[in-house]
């Protein structure tokens, strides 16, 4: 909605149509839930190859919050969107893990009245000096994957803080996870001030 005064924004369904994106300059894929077909991936790839801009806001893991609240934990499962395979060809590897960051947004704990957890899975981004984000407030990102790049000529826009770490592949997400760390001085890594700990998200 904030972009409407400056851009013409429309929803588009590719549905295997090779020319579905011909009238667009940029494509935003936001929180996809189901796998992309080979035909749709081919159309998107051709759009990018012809100079179209592509923005993907996605997570490769599915986390059921209702199960998390009911049982105190939940298994994360891979969405297998197939889009990540195309992005890998562009030099972006999206790992099937989760970033945990002390710089995070607290989460309401439904098991206790007015109780909030240090919810390290809801990362509060550390903005870089990139012109796109340098004048905006930090962005909250829940259940965010780590991104790796095969190309060194990449400028990160949003990262985690230096006091962050990554989970294993497809982890179990637990509400009690936060109690495993010292609330007064939580450290997810042994050297929480080292910039090498910053993860791209």
Task: List where the protein language model places each region.
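Acidic, S/T/G-rich, low-cysteine, solvent-exposed domains in lumenal/extracellular/periplasmic regions
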Residues: 1-201
């Amino acid at each position: 909605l904030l972009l409407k005064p400056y851009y013409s924004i429309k929803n588009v369904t590719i549905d295997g149509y090779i020319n579905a994106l011909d009238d667009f300059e940029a494509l935003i894929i936001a929180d996809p839930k189901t796998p992309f077909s080979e035909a749709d991936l081919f159309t998107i790839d051709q759009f990018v190859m012809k100079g179209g801009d592509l923005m993907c806001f996605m997570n490769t893991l599915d986390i059921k919050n209702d199960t998390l609240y009911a049982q105190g934990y939940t298994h994360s499962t891979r969405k297998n969107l197939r889009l990540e395979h195309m992005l890998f060809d562009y030099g972006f590897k999206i790992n099937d893990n989760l970033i945990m960051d002390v710089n995070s947004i607290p989460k309401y704990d439904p098991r206790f009245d007015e109780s909030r957890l240090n919810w390290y899975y809801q990362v509060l981004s550390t903005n870089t000096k990139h012109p796109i984000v340098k004048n905006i407030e930090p962005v909250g990102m829940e259940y965010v994957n780590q991104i790796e790049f095969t190309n060194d000529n990449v400028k990160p826009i949003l990262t985690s803080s230096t006091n962050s770490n990554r989970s294993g592949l497809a982890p179990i997400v637990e509400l009690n996870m936060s109690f495993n760390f010292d609330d007064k001085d939580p450290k997810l890594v042994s050297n929480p001030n080292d910039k090498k700990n910053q993860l791209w998200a």
